Amino acid sequence: YPKITIVDIKYANDALKAADDIKATLQAYPNLKGIFASNEGAAIGLAVAKKETGSKVVAIGYDSGKTQKDAIMDGTLLGSITQNPVGIGECVVNSLAKAIKGEKLEKILDTGFYWYDKSNIADPKVAAVLYD
């Protein structure tokens, strides 16, 4: 994506640290268009920072949890990406069975994921992989 510039990368799985880091980033880059928070704690921190600063930045999270789902429903977060634990479990069991038989395993295994937002958060297939 040549027209996208990554201005900073921070790591925080703690919501309070993430909120502080994101508020500082929003202050340093007032024209920032979007932020991706790569775990539940960071996504909660992103929602908090957006609410506390009044920022209009597009906010995307990862995983789920009640606070993150609520932030999607109230429009603070546009949506999130969640893992597919059923797909992960199926992939692990199938890979173990192949390994036991001495079969070659793929180097890359896609266990699946879901994008969810207001429009599909209640879809049974999506809701089944979300947690509170």
Language-model-derived ranges and their functions:
Residues 1-132:
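A residue-level marker of the well-folded mature domains of exported/periplasmic proteins
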